[in-house]
Amino acid sequence: EETLTRSLVEAKRRGVDVRVITPNIPDKKHVKWMTEYYYGELLKCGIRIYEYTPGFVHSKVVLEEHCAVVGTINMDYRSFYLHYENGIWIYNEEFLQEVRKDFDETFRVSREITYEEWKNRPIKRQVMQHFLKVFSTLV
């Protein structure tokens, strides 16, 4: 998590438009709480975070000007080393237009999280998040 966080922050500092979408409705509450733990550092650095409101979202997209990677790969140890997950590299401009349209629609139906909102989350959740962080590499 720290390597990914650091990479996102460094990209933002280089002027990259970095936005993150996470599910508002989780499949596992403890995973949502662990994910939410990292919002603060990202938000403080100007990275915009959104929660997808219509339901659960599991897709992952990295979108650049001339290419994209689309898949369902979780950014964690288990997905990279224990599971056989994958994504596809897209560089076809026509298909990229479809990815961009889907991307824009996903942001349209997502709710942006502010730093103030994150900072003022319930104390009980904050305590639980600090506890769960210890186990984050195992989940």
Indicate where each model-derived feature is located:
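PLD/PLD-like phosphodiesterase catalytic module centered on the HKD motif
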Residues: 1-139
